[in-house]
A protein has these predicted regions:
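Terminal low-complexity, poorly structured segments
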Residues: 7-10, 71, 102, 122
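Short acidic-hydrophobic, aromatic-tinged amphipathic segments that line or gate anion-handling sites
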Residues: 114-121
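N-terminal hydrophobic or amphipathic segments with adjacent small-residue motifs
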Residues: 21, 29, 68-70, 116
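A short, charged, amphipathic alpha-helix used as a generic interaction element across diverse proteins
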Residues: 122, 126-128
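Short, low-complexity N-terminal regulatory "tails/caps" that precede and couple sensory modules
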Residues: 1-5
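Amphipathic alpha-helical interaction surfaces in cytosolic regulatory modules
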Residues: 36-113
């Protein structure tokens, strides 16, 4: 089991507007977030994800399918996490709902962030 923050069955409150947690599934870290990924929450989002990533070497899946809103600060945090994964030679995938995917595609980051449509597809890609 990964060290660092404990995996939890319920999402913990990272800020007033963002909850997050992770689980280990199919030899991958699966992060789940709900709420808003914006200027107010990006610092806590980044710190939480970075702490978990630094504690182990498993591939990472960021499930943002329940995120209501992403602004430029949130996109910046996602880019930094993607760079952290790339620098560590860690495979990663990102899943988003229509709103999140549209925002990512608007700034042409879908390939850089390894955006896919759903969690099963992401897990398949990471285990290949």
């Amino acid at each position: 089991m990964p060290e660092g923050p404990e995996p939890i069955s319920e999402l913990q409150r990272l800020t007033v507007s963002l909850r997050g947690g992770f689980e280990q599934k199919d030899r991958c870290l699966v992060f789940h977030f709900t709420g808003q990924l914006d200027a107010y929450s990006e610092k806590q989002f980044s710190e939480y994800a970075s702490d978990v990533l630094k504690a182990n070497k498993l591939p990472a899946l960021f499930d943002l399918s329940k995120i209501d809103f992403v602004d430029s600060s949130g996109l910046g945090a996602l880019v930094q996490l993607a760079k952290q994964c790339t620098d560590a030679k860690r495979a990663f995938q990102l899943v988003g709902n229509t709103r999140v995917a549209q925002t990512i595609k608007l700034v042409r980051l879908e390939e850089f962030l390894h955006l896919v449509n759903d969690v099963p597809t992401a897990l398949r890609n990471l285990s290949a």
